[in-house]
Structure formats: structure tokens, C-alpha cells
């Protein structure tokens, strides 16, 4: 039996501002944007040409979900953006105003830095060794 993770839900405040951040600042591709009803859309994004695992931008619909925006993992890094050229992507993201929470560092597993999205969700930018 073949199985894989198809999408990971990321709670956002607004579909359009989230799409803009991810496509303009992180150079993600908008895979799908389908209106389901007056308030809900099916919005999938992914880095470049990656489509096997996508991020589902899910607009918060309840006060409980709104509280989780930017903190779905209780302050820990939530998502890991792997790159084949750390310094290229780090400088490109920095020039576009992405907020980095630390200086890049070398770890036994690779070069890494923590950054935040527009809502405070923590990500690792990571080039594995």
C-alpha cells in the first residue's frame, strides 16, 4: 500500500494576504484556489514545482482557530523548508523582508535558520548535509 502526506493545513487570517506572502516573499507556487462557498476556499500552495506535499491555507472560522493562528505548535517550529542552496534562498528571502529570528547556524544535520511567516508561524530554512 502506497501512502503519503498530501497536504498540511496551516491556519491563516486571510486567504489573499497569505497567498501574497507565500508567493511573493517565499516564491511558492499557487497550486489551487477553488471557492467552496461564500466563506471557504480550497487553497493549496507549494515551493516551486513541488506538488507531492502541499500546504492547505485554511482560514480561521472560529475564535478557537483564530487563537491558533501563528502558534499551531505552541511556539515551536512548525514547518521545514528544505533548499539546495541555503545562502541563495536566505538572501532572497531577507531582501523581500522575511523576518528571521536568529542568525544562520551550522548544525550536524545542515545549515539552518528560523524565520516567521506573516502571522508568526515559525519555519526552518534548511540545507541538509
In which residue ranges do the predicted regions lie?
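Vicinal oxygen chelate
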Residues: 1-7, 29-82, 90-118, 126-129
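Conserved beta-strand-loop-alpha-helix junction that forms the acyl-donor binding cleft
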Residues: 12-15, 36-38
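Helix N-cap motif at beta-to-alpha junctions
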Residues: 14-15, 84-87
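Conserved active-site tyrosine of GNAT-family acetyltransferases
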Residues: 18-23, 93, 120
